[in-house]
Amino acid sequence: MKFDQVIEIPRPKIDIDETLSNIPRVARFIPGVEEVREMEDGSFEGILKVKVGPMTILLNGRVDVEQNQEAGDWVLKAKAQDKRIGGGASSTITAKVKQLDSGNTELAIASDIQLMGRLGELGQPLIKRKAVEMIEGFAQNLKASFE
């Protein structure tokens, strides 16, 4: 499943870049993130707890982050499992940060998410609704962090 979202943030690009580069902090802007820790190899491990329809999903996973801060490009590749329900997810999230003439910053997020096992059996409309809700929650929390 693919999702695209564009967020305009009333801050200069340098502020957004600085915030996004603090992965443990910015990860907590995602609704349901319970824990994030940086590993020795520069990747991150964490826990995401989210209710989708009748199921509460507890994903334990790893995220690899590639960034070209000068160009404003970020790529996050994640894989996670919920061993209790026998399912998992993998995703690639691309973010592009761009300074606007107004002085605001545009953050364009493209997400490609694959679900496996029992998670893959959930209906796409249900999953899409939850994914959009989480992206919107992230955007609200990111904006609120500058207030």
Model-derived regions: residue spans:
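Glycine-rich portal/gate segments that line the openings of hydrophobic small-molecule binding cavities
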Residues: E38-Q81
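Short strand-connecting beta-turns/loops that link adjacent beta-strands
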Residues: P12, D41, E70-A71, L100-G103
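Hydrophobic ligand-binding cavity/cleft-lining segments
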Residues: M1-K49
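Hydrophobic pocket/interface hotspot
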Residues: I16-L20, V26, V65, I109, ...
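Beta-strand/loop substructures that line and gate deep hydrophobic ligand-binding cavities in soluble
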Residues: A80-R129
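Intrinsic-disorder/low-complexity, polar/charged segments enriched in Ser/Thr/Lys/Arg/Asp/Glu/Gln
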Residues: K2-V6, S43-E45, L58-N60, D73, ...
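Hydrophobic/aromatic beta-strand elements that line small-molecule binding cavities or substrate pockets
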Residues: Q5, E34, N60-Q67, S91-Q99
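Short, highly charged C-terminal tails/helix-capping segments
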Residues: Q140-E147
